[in-house]
Structure formats: structure tokens, C-alpha cells
Amino acid sequence: MLNSALLWKVWLRIDNSTDEVNQPIAVQFDEIDTVDDLKSRFFQKLSSTRWREINDNASIAIGLYAPKFDNQADNTSSNNTNDNSCRSKSNGAGSGANLSVNSNTKSSVSPTAGSFGLSKDLAKDRNVLQHPKPTQKRGALYDAFAAVPTVAATTNVDFPPNEAPMLSPQRPYSTSPKQFPATTKSPLLRFASVSPYPKFHSDNQIMASAGLTYVSPHNKNKYTRPLIRKGLNFTTESVNDCTYKIIFEPDELAINIYKELFGTMGSQPASQPLLIFSNVNLRQDVPPLDILNVVDYVPTNEEISQQKTQPTDHGAVGVFHLDDHISPGEQGLKQTIGDKADLKGKDGNSSPQEFKLITDEEQLRRASQELKDEEKDAESPWQAILLLPKGYKGGVDFRNKPVAHTDSSFNNEDTITHSELEVNTGSPSQESGSLNEAGIGITQPMSEVQRRKEDVTPASPILTSSQTPHYSNSLYNAPFAVSSPPDPLPNLFTTTSEKVFPKINVLIVEDNVINQAILGSFLRKHKISYKLAKNGQEAVNIWKEGGLHLIFMDLQLPVLSGIEAAKQIRDFEKQNGIGIQKSLNNSHSNLEKGTSKRFSQAPVIIVALTASNSQMDKRKALLSGCNDYLTKPVNLHWLSKKITEWGCMQALIDFDSWKQGESRMTDSVLVKSPQKPIAPSNPHSFKQATSMTPTHSPVRKNSNLSPTQIEL
């Protein structure tokens, strides 16, 4: 029976795992949970592991290993011979099979009925269920777990080892290629439901033949009980001549598996877990060199660890050198042409490509220095280093596009037409570009503005149809620099980030010092002024000082939460009429009160910073008055685009204030510049002149204020 007072949990462990720490994990389940539910909860336990990233619910299965028996052998000598042969095969297999299985026997030679333990003769990582030889033909689960036979011995046929089905690789462990045939069961005492307590039915009769009498290994009493359990749905997969896998179906109830294998709830120890079989193995062999495509090949961590154990010769050619650990999201794939890679000889025949794969920045610098030293030798062929970014797709055909020429026409100049120039400038990398050692190493991804500047540079101006410059084919000459015409647009492509980002004032409300440093460093880099606040109340006080256009508000703040701080700011804006269209008289009165000196006429943009993806948190942030929200960790490249967007929105909403700021700057320059004062003939001429100022200039709205007074 199952103990209802205990938590229902089952121990699971990953089979054939390359991790050094592979401990059993307890997974709780209910009476209606199936094997699929156990898989989902097991994935939740390992949500942050690499094993979880490469596996899914359809690629794993729950089961265990079981031994194969020769049921036709009745004498003891033959049984011992078969056991020894299977034991020797298991030990000889080594890590090829990598059997990491359940252990339910104390001795593999003559275990007693119902005993569980580990076979001493087996390897530490190869534990196979061992049970006594049955005296009659029974089902596979009975042989593996000493379970009760479901049918009579005359109707139950053993599953031949040579006909053990193999699972389909397209749908691994999710379907049943071959199952044991379903048969009718004897009308014996059984469980009518998954309740921990058995129920008797009127149609059940306690009648069992002597051949089917069975003493349960989980029953501590000594009397015989003809108790039969519900048959389990499972498939088998042959591992070797002595062992096969038992894989439970996804729709099988977990409670039926537990009481069939372990009996009462809580009787399964952590040393006897069920196994998680996976068809995606973390340990993969390095593919042969002759079938390896360097452009599309990205080494895995296991391949790199295997290469570390082997001696590495940096001077060898045509050998892959995986010298450093490279993880996803780090340095891109770097491919280097070998020391003696002569792509096109003097006779015109192409030689085989020789290359080295480099993933270490220091080794890349050494290779660059070697190429630089070889330049002094005039007879050595020209070398190059090709840097490929992570995720690069496509081939690199060196035969159709030779990098260097060694013939006599090396220094001859050819004419490049305007159409060819467009093709060359549109490509991400120039074939005739010089080697730049300063740019070798880990490079940051370019922003959109930088990428546009790289595509069209001042050295490649816009040409008319009458201008056809001449260029050199030399590898180490500057591209497009020979006899080029004067640049018709000298300052067209000298844009910087200072002109891209709007002039806004930002308030960072964050209690985390690390997040403050990251955002502050980003804003300082782009010349954006900002202030810091550690809690919501401090943010409200700083906002009341005025001059802010954008607020990054963290929702989880001490003293006053981000949501409450946003509500107070919006309420204060309503009380002061910020964001409400007013007439000229009202704006004139506000200017006299001095309110517009501190606050702009546009409401501040509040962006919520949240670490949760919950729609409820985002909804609360928007209802509190936030204009937008960002989920941590914030992508800085994406943040730069959003700052430009929010700054443009603020400029469009409060266009008069932005124009007023530009006019203040202009008036300040005019006041500081030395000019001869002109005395007006009429004392009211200044007022008349100011009244004729166009109405679209907000600086002249108040005719009683001079330009110097407005500046103050």
C-alpha cells in the first residue's frame, strides 16, 4: 500500500551523463500524474543547465535497465556459465555502452528473492538489475523487478532478445514501436483505483493456482498473498547480449510504476533511482577532418576538452587547434590560413587549402606576428587572417577569389568601373584590405550608425559618370586611395553619437549599484546627462527640481516603490497642469509664477525596469503612469535606439520648449558678442519691435522680457 501521510516523490537520475556531479533528483507527483508530467517537472529542476537546452520532452524517456535471462536453462551449471559470460561482456564493454542503471541486488551470484543491492562484479558506473532465475516462463517485468505475472505461464511468451525493437530516431521515446501483447488477467484481488488503500469488489474471487503463488518482496509478512497489480505499458530496447532497456510509456501513471517497482510510498532509496534516457548525448566525437566544413563547424565544449588532453603543435599545418574554452555568445569563430597555404601557384594550379582553427586571442596575435615577420621574406607567399563572426553562414571560396598574385603583374594597376565599386563597397569585407593588427581580438558588435559609416566611407565618395579613378591591386596598399579625386563631400560622413542622441536629461532610479554603474557608464559614453536616485521618494524629490525628460524607474525599490513613485509624479503633473493644452493667457500667468522655469510643458517619460516577464507586473506599471517598460537584463544596443525614440517623442510633445532652448543659446551668443549699441529714437520702439515678432517663436511670447532676462 502507498502511505498517504508522506509526500509522493520518486528519485530520478540522468543516464550516461558526462557531468562529474550527477546526483539523483527527487520529483514530487500526484495520483493523476503521468510519465510526461514527471518529465516536465524534471525539466523544471534543471531549467538553468545545458542539458535542458539541448533536450526536450520528446527526446527523453523514463525507465531502467534489466538483465536478459536464458529461461530454458534449468541446471545450475548452465546458469552460472551464462551469468559469467554476461558479466564478462558487461565488464569488457567498458564505457562504450555507458550503462548507468538501477541496482536492486546484493549479490549477482545467488541473490535471495526480493533482495536489492549492487552487484560487486560490475563496474561502478554499470549497475544492472539482477534477480534469481525464474522456474517458469514469465513476463519481462517479472524477471526484472520480481513482479507478479499477469497471465498464466502457458500463454505468456518470452520476448526474444534478437527481436528487441529499436526506437525510431525521428520520434525518440515518444511512441511505442513494439509492446507486449495485452492479455486478460486473472480475477484476483486488485486495486480498483490509485488510492493508497485497496478496495474489494464483489466480482473478485481470491483464487490462484499454486504455480502463480507469489510472496511479494515488499511485504514484510511471511504469508502468501496472490495480489496482482495492473500491468504497465512499456517498450524494450536491446543494449547488449545481457542487458536491455525498459522504457515506460508517456501516458503511464507514475503511481502505478512506483507501487509496481517499490511498493509502499517512501520505500525507494536515493541510491535506486529511475533513469532518464536521452537520445541527445552531450559527449560527441570530433568528426573526421576530411568531412569537416570549417565555415559551418562550431566546436562544442566536449570537443574542446578532448583536444586539451592531446598534445598541441602550433606549428603543424592542416590540424585543428582548439586551444581555449569557447562558450555560446563569446568570441566568434576565427579561421586562419596556414603557414604555407599557397592558394594559387605560379603554374596556375590550385593547391589544397591548409588552415588552422584558432579560438584563443593570444594565439591569434602570435599568428599575426608570424605573418608580419614573413613579410620580410620576398619569396614567401602573401598570407592573410580571416575573421568570421559567430553565426556566419555561407561558404568561403578561395579558389574563385584569389587573395594574392605572385606573377609579374602584381604591381600593375587595373581600372575598376563604377558598377564594380558599388559591389565592393557593399560587401562586408574588402578583399584587398590591409592587415590591421590593432583590430585583432574580441570585437564588439557594431551599431546601426557605425555599420552605415563602414558601408560608405569618405575614401569611397559618390562618383559621377565622368569620374573613373584608378586603383591598385596590391594587398597591403590602402583600398581606393590611388589617384582618387578630391572628396566632394568632406564632412558628410563624420557623424558621431553626439549628433545622433537627443539632448535629454535622464534620471536613473535603481537601488542596485551594479545596474547603476552599467546604465551610468552607457549614458556617459554617449554624452547624456543623468542623475541617480536610490529609492522612490528620492526620485520624486529630484523630479520636483525640474529639468528631467526621461526616468528609468525600477519597480522594486525601498522606502517608496517604483509604482507609487510613478503615481505621485503623474498626480503632481495633473495638479500643475503639465501636459494640458492651455491658452496664451494661462501660459503667460504660469510664466510669471515661475512654474515653467522648473517644469516643461510636456510630461516626463517614465520607463519601468522590471526583472519579471509577468504580464500582471507590466500591466501595473502601465496603469501607474509608466510609458514603457524594459525587462532586465537590458540590451544596451537596443537601449540606444529606445533613447533616441523617447528623446524624439519628448521633442515632438514639447516642441515650444525645445525651440526655446535653442533660442536661449542663440540669444546668449548675441549678448556676449561685441556690438555697438543703437539707441532707439522712440522709447516704445523696442516694444513695437517685439510685438512684430512672428508668433511661432516662443521666446517672444512675453514682450515685457528682454533676451537677457529670458536667459536667466
UniProtKB/Swiss-Prot annotation:
Functional summary from the UniProt entry: Final receptor of the SLN1-YPD1-SSK1 two-component regulatory system, which controls activity of the HOG1 pathway in response to changes in the osmolarity of the extracellular environment. Under normal osmotic conditions, maintained in a phosphorylated and inactive state by the phosphorelay intermediate protein YPD1. Under conditions of high osmolarity, the histidine kinase SLN1 is no longer active and the unphosphorylated form of SSK1 interacts with and activates SSK2 and SSK22, two MAPKKKs that further stimulate the PBS2-HOG1 MAPKK-MAPK cascade.
Reported consequences of knocking out the gene: Increases arsenite sensitivity.
Species assigned in the record: Saccharomyces cerevisiae (strain ATCC 204508 / S288c) (Baker's yeast)
Subunit-structure text: Interacts with SSK2, SSK22 and YPD1.
Modified residues (Phosphoserine): S110, S195, S327, S351, S368, S380, S673, S703, S706
Biological processes, Gene Ontology terms: cellular hyperosmotic response; cellular response to acidic pH; osmosensory signaling via phosphorelay pathway; regulation of actin cytoskeleton organization; regulation of p38MAPK cascade
Region (Disordered): 73-114, 340-362, 448-468, 672-712
Protein name: Osmolarity two-component system protein SSK1
Chain positions found as 4-aspartylphosphate: D554
Cross-referenced SUPFAM superfamilies: CheY-like
Keyword Phosphoprotein: yes
Any one of the GO CC terms: cytoplasm
Entry PTM: The phosphorelay mechanism involves the sequential transfer of a phosphate group from 'His-576' (H1) to 'Asp-1144' (D1) of SLN1, then to 'His-64' (H2) of YPD1 and finally to Asp-554 (D2) of SSK1.
Keywords for the protein's UniProt record, in alphabetical order: Cytoplasm, Phosphoprotein, Two-component regulatory system
